[in-house]
């Protein structure tokens, strides 16, 4: 165990630098706003800065912990499931995994508290059942080699048909639920499951199908909340604003975070427990890993736990009040439109601070053998989230229904999916769920809520939906990146095909078609 801890120290330093690069731009933007057009109280600023420190340290531990534990656990469980060749076992365990992991997702508790017209347990269990059901659908797709785009057309078509019968107050929350439930606890494990299942297949399309699980799992919660929206009255939906902190000295500042810490210690422990228990069962029955591997996974789980506790404490206690207050000040400064470009700037950088984004980017780079670099993936996500936040702020200022954005957005995203390589489509729809994590829920959503309060809008219908918007635009930007790569590859092949003709060496008419058009 000591050797494992010592070996992880250089990696921790590397992860610390990555975390600083992700969080410092957000801190810089907020500080510039605080000292210029959006003055805030010292209490809120100090809470924000201490929250930023906790988030940096938390991301450092979480990203390394996920590499050491969540990813290998998911890959091994997925491989064992597929190797069993028993479809009822694969689907049954898949449903159970999806259900248990979702119940333990911390962000789902936050969503449930924002929808008082539906009992918390009813909402949580319905959403968890939706994720479990669609995880089994995702497993079936991978095992049978079914293309992702037709499934997306069918399921999102059903979503928008149901949306026509749901009260307006439920629409934004329903679409938010799809992004909220694919958070830092769910994503690493589910993505690793996909890699494990596809690795056993071993055919030429296995890498393409290793992504797409998060994409399908995001549909389940949306359908669940829409169905609940038809069954429950929306008149009781209310918005509970976050309490703005007031501290007079450093001791009170620490006490504020110290009071929130036990809650997140308990939340994350209950979140990790189902995954650990499930892995323990697999270890006893089928895996039987050696002690060194188990020791590495145990250290990784400890890092994951510490990282998530620190990140969520910093985000909820430090970032959430700051986001809400900044939104109120910016939208109430006499030039409310200024929140649109500022929101876009914050959105561009804040996605880099999402813990699960690191897992996605790294896995994409590994599965594609570097064809899609983590840097390129990060830029596509940042561009998508920036556009999302800008559109969300337009909604806050105008009160336009979220469907005017989501229906065209998903139509474009699904339309593109039929012309880009399958791998890019699966990655793009996974990226949408990954980008809308805890940083979106604890900073961007409060920013929109604060702005909505300042302009006198309806919080439930106009401010909610930020998570849904953030989950939508990466579907388009990542696929456009794939389309650009496809066109670039096509031009290179065309240039290579033209060289013999230009040199008068050989006739290209006899070349096999596959050499010319296969991408």
Give residue ranges: language-model regions.
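Transmembrane alpha-helix boundary signature
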Residues: 39, 62-73, 99-111, 168-170, ...
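Structural signature of hydrophobic alpha-helical transmembrane segments
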Residues: 48-60, 117-129, 176-190, 242-243, ...
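Signature of multi-pass transmembrane helix bundles
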Residues: 1-64, 79-80, 178, 191, ...
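Helix-loop-helix junctions within the multi-pass membrane cores of secondary transporters/permeases
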Residues: 78-79, 87-158, 336-417
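Transmembrane helix-loop boundary segments of multi-pass membrane transporters
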Residues: 46-47, 65, 112-124, 142-157, ...
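Small-residue-rich segments of transmembrane alpha-helices in multi-pass membrane proteins
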Residues: 26-30, 58, 86-94, 154-165, ...
